[in-house]
Every structure is written in C-alpha cells, then in structure tokens.
Curated annotation (Swiss-Prot):
Membrane protein topology class: Peripheral membrane protein
Taxonomic superkingdom: Bacteria
SUPFAM superfamilies per the UniProt record, alphabetical: N-terminal domain of the delta subunit of the F1F0-ATP synthase (SSF47928)
Organism: Proteus mirabilis (strain HI4320)
HAMAP family in alphabetical order: ATP_synth_delta_bact
Protein known as: ATP synthase subunit delta
Reported function: F(1)F(0) ATP synthase produces ATP from ADP in the presence of a proton or sodium gradient. F-type ATPases consist of two structural domains, F(1) containing the extramembraneous catalytic core and F(0) containing the membrane proton channel, linked together by a central stalk and a peripheral stalk. During catalysis, ATP synthesis in the catalytic domain of F(1) is coupled via a rotary mechanism of the central stalk subunits to proton translocation.
GO cellular component: plasma membrane; proton-transporting ATP synthase complex
Main location: membrane
Amino acid sequence: MSEIATVARPYAKAAFDFAVENQAVDKWQVMLAFTAEVARNEQVTELLSGSLASEKLADIFIDLCGDQIDEHAQNLIRVMAENDRLSTLPEVLSQFIQLRAVLESTVDVEVTSAIELTKQQLANISAAMEKRLSRKVKLNCKIDKSVIAGMIIRAGDLVIDGSVRGRLERLTDVLQS
C-alpha cells in the first residue's frame, strides 16, 4: 500500500498544483474521480495488466473516459500510461482529496459508535474536535455494534478510543501482563 502511495504522490501533487493554479480544483476532483472509477473497472484492470503499448493503452483509456476529462487530464493519463501507472489512479484521487483538505484547512474525522448519534451529539463532537485540532472538521459517521457502547474517533493519526470494547481490550492487556 505504501508503495502505491509513493508512486501516486507525484501525479496527485502535479494534478493538484495545476488545478489550484487554474482555479479548477472541483473540476479536477470530478475528473480524477471518474478516471479512478474507470481504472477500478474489472475489464479495464485486466487491460491495464496486459501487454499493450503505453500509447495504445492511453488512447483506449482516454476513449473510455470520453468527454468526462479535458485535454489537461488527458495529458496526465498519457504520462501515467507511459510510466505504467494508470492502475494507481484511485490512490491519486485519494491523495488529491487529502491535498485539497489541507488547502481548505479541513480534516476528515471518522466517528464510530454502536448506535446512531443525535444531531446535538454530532455538533458537540465537531466543536470539540475543531477546538482540539484548530481546523474545521468534516464528520463521517459509522455504526459498528462491536463497539458495544461509547465511540471511537479517528482524525488522521489521532485515535480517541472511548468505546467499551477498547476499555475491555486495555483491561485484558493489563490483566495479562
């Protein structure tokens, strides 16, 4: 996974820098999302792992995308095909989104709880995380019954585990040591 991230990083950075410079970040995110979906397609995946010449592969990929991508995105596709990197498009999209979040000073916060949280609880979590991280947050909520009670909050490298499951695991570790 980290190898794919390393390979995708320069393409994501180049696309992001170009998008910012041309005030087209939304447009580029849509184009990259479309190309990532094309790259994820099972038949396209087989095509990418085949032995087609890079120029032919780029032409086929661009034809599949049709008018969903502009000439600049087509150039990115050609360069990525030339370097045998089209399969990394989903990771390029992921890193592009991360770069955009940094630019907009937002951070994705994943909240996992056993039950659905109320709007007031979500507002309280959002306010507390914005204060702690000194950035705007975007909450993504998941329900996972294995949490038992409480919640787990993830924001980048920060993990706050206030779940009963987490407490039981920590207690088990203490008792076993």
